[in-house]
Amino acid sequence: MEPESKKELQSPASSFVMSSETMWESTPRQPESTSLSWSPRKSLRSLTVFTDYCQFGYPTRSLRAGFQELPPLPEPQTLRLRPASLRTQDISHLLARVFRNLYTAQVIGDDLSDSLIKARGSEDARHEEFLDQLQQARAIYKKRLDDVAMLEKHITQARARDIAETEHATKQGRLHVVEAPVKLPPVKTVFRWCIDNELMQKHHLISTEDYYNDPLPFCPAPKRSPTPMYSKMTFSCEKRFTHKSDLERKAEEHCRKLVEFDDLEYTTDSLRSVSKTKGKTKVTIKKASTPANKKWMEHLQVPQRALDRRLLARMQNRNHYLKNPRFFPPNTPHGGKSLIVPSRKPERRGSLSAKPEWRCVCSSRRIPGNVSFRVNLDLVYGGPQTLASQGSVPEESGVLGSTSGMAFDPQGPRVRLFSAVRSRGVDPWEPVWASSGHPKWGGAGAGAYSHVTLAWYVDYLFLLL
């Protein structure tokens, strides 16, 4: 019975070993030279099968106690690189193999969690509870990431301020020191004043108070800067610009005292010397009714109104600007004008009040065969102007002499030509015409003319400087 029971207790591995041995034994034997090489090969085969079976336990115990075989281990993902590779340091497959119930290789990332939260609404209560926990975990994770970023930014800014202050203090100290004998930090660091210790302690980080034991210096609050003198009112300014409310209040108090004094009349009796008071009947003062036009309710007094108008005119005069000519074409009334050059004409040199004075002098000379003459026209209108004309007439004619000249017309840009004819019986060596008048109207001299004839008009542009 023992051999049968032993055969029943044999494991599949032993049966596999026996089957392999029988397979090798059933094959035809080779010569003696080859029989020696088959025996070690058969033992090697049986050893490899035995070691594969005993990978997770002892075969003797499993044979005696009858334990069941462990399920085969899952292989890692094919796309995951092995830790022996130089391109990765992932050990998740080791953790997944050792801690099967606590670790999974599939991690829920940001995209998967966002899609799960957005697509919630399932009827499964367990799934909804899982999504709630996932959402809370994601919120806590994001909050901690924000806190870490904020702390990192705060520490970076504190270090930058510390470096800037240290460099500034070092440059100021080197202005008076040629060379420092000891190469040490020349100034004390101000990092402890740039960082927030409460914030560091709140997030369980090392603060400057952990390694600085000296007490903080007591600094009083800064005092308020006094009011500068230029912003205070002077004595004359206070006297001149008194508030209107103060004046009205003083006037009302004065009027109230006068009314109270007038209400009582004190009389003295000569016999009893008793003062008696006689009350006067109060005269009811009718208040002015509200006018129909409410705009006249708050009217100003005449002096105040004049002052306001004067101030308004001064402000308008200061703020009056010419229209910008760049927005108007030159043919418009306000277009093409300059903002700097005034539009009015410049004043003429000389006296403007003086009236224009005309003076015409004519002289003649006898020449065989004819009589020559010369006319000098002097114009005084702001500045002296002299115009001259010469001419001659034959002596055989009935006219012994003739004069001609030019006159300026103030009414328009034209020059008037005129001539004077002298009769016989006048000495040709004497001046023909010496007169102060206006040649425009043909005024004659004192006895020198017989008549003056007006000739023709010639359009001529005349520039008066």
From Swiss-Prot:
GO terms for molecular function: alpha-tubulin binding; beta-tubulin binding. Keywords: Cytoplasm, Differentiation, Spermatogenesis, Tumor suppressor. Its main location: cytoplasm. One of its GO terms (biological process) is spermatogenesis. Residues 1-38, 322-350 are annotated as: Disordered. The keyword Transmembrane helix does not apply. InterPro entries: DLEC1. Residues 11-38 have a biased composition (Polar residues). One of its GO terms (cellular component) is cytoplasm. It is found in: Cytoplasm. Essential for spermatogenesis and male fertility. May play an important role in sperm head and tail formation. May act as a tumor suppressor by inhibiting cell proliferation. Interacts with alpha-and beta-tubulin. Interacts with BBS2, BBS4, BBS5, MKKS, TCP1, CCT2, CCT3, CCT4, CCT5 and CCT7. This is Deleted in lung and esophageal cancer protein 1 homolog. The lineage of its organism: Eukaryota, Metazoa, Chordata, Craniata, Vertebrata.
